Amino acid sequence: MDSSYKARKEAFVSNLAGGSILEINAVTLVAPTSVLLWSVLQSRLSFFIPYGALALVTDFFLNVLPILFATTLYSSAPWTLNILLALPALILLFTSTPSRTQQKAKPPRPSAAAKKNTPKHASDSPEPLPVHPFLTTYRAAMMVITCVAILAVDFRIFPRRFAKAENWGTSLMDLGVGSFVFSSGVVSARSILKGRNSHSKKAGLWQRLAASARHSIPLLVLGLVRLYSVKGLDYAEHVTEYGVHWNFFFTLGLLPPFVEIFDALAAIIPSYEILSLGIVVLYQVALESTDLKSYILVSPRGPDLLSKNREGVFSFLGYLAIFLTGRAIGIRIIPRGTSASRSPQQARKSVLISLGLQTLVWTTLFVFNSTHAMGLGAGIPVSRRLANMPYVLWVSAFNNAQLFLFCLLESTFFPSIHRETGKDGELERTSFATSRIMTAFNKNGLALFLVANLLTGAVNLSVPTLDVTTAHAMVVLIAYVAMITGVALALDRANIKLSL
């Protein structure tokens, strides 16, 4: 890469201050609003059954393009985009009646041999840990926003206030990094819950650390590949983001073994929220009462690896706290929650109340931690670079709110998903209530994140992103998200799930 252009690229993403949380909320609200319109079309018209070309294009226009437009063409008017999506949904909602059936797509009937070899209770007994469409949609929407932002940020059409803040401030991309980790924590709860349901003896800590290392190795290898690619291609890099050598793949790769250590502590302190708060409170105390903050932010970089990568090393504590908070939420919302005395409706109401209360609690903690609310707040600014306490609280509050909104939409438009007594019927209703594209994004999220990074690198090496017109930028970005969507759908159609 030409040295002068590389310097321009690095300056383009450096020394930024972020934007307002209210604007970030308006932009990210586009995802639930798009799902609102999708849900009305599906619940009232069974629009996406069968899933033909028109359904595919509409799905793409509803669940992918609005997020791209919210961060580019409508970045200065996100509420306008929200209204444009909500208005047809409300009109259709009040001028049509619910579809008489949500069972147009029947699962294939098992063969006689399969029936004979299948225990009677196998297909009739519902899963204790069912698939939740709202959770699939939440994770997929987060992945779409992440994939959009990592390339769009290199174009001028993407506002600088949405790019990562240098030291202090809130931005869309700052939120996206934390949300990626939070959502990983949410789904990690499934393995914990399976272990509890199996009633088998839990493996020892060293065995679990060895197993977690096997999950870490591919991510650490990807981190090394990215490191050598960036250095070898003389690619523009933002050193103060994670450090000289560190990158996000290293953060993701180191999470599993450290999470296992804190999972062992959960036997003593049976609350992942308390463990999370314990980590971030101690970290924040260290930042405020020692020279750690100035060491991370302004100290000259020494020759040792810690000094060169101090942002990545110390911010890891904040991301670990975020992951544990996500796991705590997953433990609450993933189980079926029904019993002889508790109906599916009551179980869903309990989940909504839990998410609502969690949103309120985390938001309150964030307000008192990051502002001078009522003269009692600490007034500590948010820093993604430090992954400090206000950042952890903000990410936790936001993701709980998003989960609440997606859960509310599912409960409103598809209330009968988990009322089926048989597994086949429940799977059919779950499929009916979930966008095919969102299912595909959720199924291979980490693999798609890797594909998005590779495509971003290819575009930046072949297109002068700082100098292209708005029209050219949008053509590139639409083609980019279409390619990622195509990869996601192809993997899903082939029933391939790449576990990294």
Swiss-Prot record:
Its main location: endoplasmic reticulum. GO terms for molecular function: glucosaminyl-phosphatidylinositol O-acyltransferase activity. It is a multi-pass membrane protein. It is found in: Endoplasmic reticulum membrane. Its EC number is 2.3.-.-. Glycans are attached at N369. It comes from the Eukaryota. Pfam families: GWT1. The keyword 4Fe-4S does not apply. Residues 100-128 are annotated as: Disordered. GO terms for biological process: GPI anchor biosynthetic process; protein localization to plasma membrane. Keywords: Acyltransferase, Endoplasmic reticulum, Glycoprotein, GPI-anchor biosynthesis, Membrane, Transferase, Transmembrane, Transmembrane helix. The chain crosses the membrane at residues 21-41, 47-67, 74-94, 133-153, 168-188, 249-269, 272-292, 311-331, 351-368, 389-409, 446-466, 471-491. Pathway: Glycolipid biosynthesis; glycosylphosphatidylinositol-anchor biosynthesis. InterPro entries: PIGW/GWT1 (IPR009447). GO terms for cellular component: endoplasmic reticulum membrane. Belongs to the PIGW family. Probable acetyltransferase, which acetylates the inositol ring of phosphatidylinositol during biosynthesis of GPI-anchor. This is GPI-anchored wall transfer protein 1. The lineage of its organism: Eukaryota, Fungi, Dikarya, Ascomycota, Pezizomycotina.
